[in-house]
Amino acid sequence: MIKKIISDSGANVLHLDDASFENIPLTIHVDGTDYQDDASLSVNEFIEALHQNDGKTSTACPSIAQWQKAFEGADEIYAITITSVLSGSYNSAVQAASLYREDHPETKIHVIDSLSAGPEMELIIDKLKESIDAGLNFDEICAKINAYKEKTHLNFALESLDNLAKNGRISPAVAKVAKMLKIRIIGR
């Protein structure tokens, strides 16, 4: 039986030792250029493009087809996504799972909204791997991960609000005042 962990790139995990794992990249649009958030991404080039860009940046979640392709060949699938508050990745994965089950009704798929990003997603992925390695069955793993998610959270600090202002998430005036007063936003 093949058990597979799949995550979008919001987790910043490219591979797992001794586990069936796949990372599906988010796409980041900056000034007419698309950057795939995967191992081929030049972080320095990407950061430079962000600094030089005065316009809006945006992201695109993995497509339903990308999720379905990643599901292929596995009997049990644990798909974890960046928070559904920030991305359509969770909805895309849920739709992909529903469509995939139509042709593969024996495949078990658990789509997990991390309600987070980055390091917290990595913790959930580690807990998934640990649960699989411990020999837990599908239902036990799903229950364990759902309970684990209730105990984790991510705190973060933003050095700048510039990108939030560029993308219409906050007022440019708020970003400017925060910058002048050297205010950093701490969130959870």
Name the predicted role of every residue range.
Residues K3, G10-T27, G32-T33, L86-S89, ...:
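Mixed-charge interfacial surface used for oligomerization/domain docking
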Residues A19, S40-N44, Q66, S114, ...:
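N-proximal short alpha-helices
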Residues T33-E102:
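Class I S-adenosyl-L-methionine
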